[in-house]
Each structure stands twice: as C-alpha cells, then as structure tokens.
Amino acid sequence: MASKHGVVGLTRTAALENAAAGIRVNAVCPGIIHTAMIDRYAHGDRGIEAQLAAGEPVGRMGSPEEVAAAAVWLCSDEAGFVTGTALPVDGGWTAQ
C-alpha cells in the first residue's frame, strides 16, 4: 500500500512542477483486472476467480480494455483540465 501512496505523491508533485509548461501528469490505479497473471494465479479455478470478483462492488473483475480506455481518456483533449490525479479503475473498490 505504501508504494501506491508513493505513486500518488509523485504524480501530484510532478503535476504541480509541470503544470505551467502545459504538461499534465496523472496516474491510473487499476484494481483486480482479468489478465494472464490472474489466470496463472487461479490455475483455471473458477472459484478463485469468483472470489476475486466478489471483492469488487461491481461484482466482477475489470478488463485490460477498461484500464486502457481510462488511460486513453486521460491522454485526450477531453481531459485537458485534469492533472495531478490518480484515477482508480477498480470497480468501486477504493470507495468502500
């Protein structure tokens, strides 16, 4: 957990240091994402996968595409006034 707070601190500091130059700095903080790493961890055991998904308020694991979409949005002009934020892409886990 300390490393995650470190990323948030670095993100905020870098955002403030670079804002005047028009450089935006943000972080994406993914939750449990269904990737090959999860597959290796669960060894194909659907029970383990279900247990991981049950810990998410939305009741499922996220997808790599959902994390990528958040990152693309942060890089887009639509997020032009967003800087210094750590965007959770975690199905509501941090809101608990």
Protein language model features and the residues they cover:
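Active-site helix of classical SDR
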Residues: 3, 11
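A short hydrophobic alpha-helix cap/turn motif
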Residues: 18-21, 33, 62, 75
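C-terminal helical subdomain
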Residues: 27, 50-82, 91
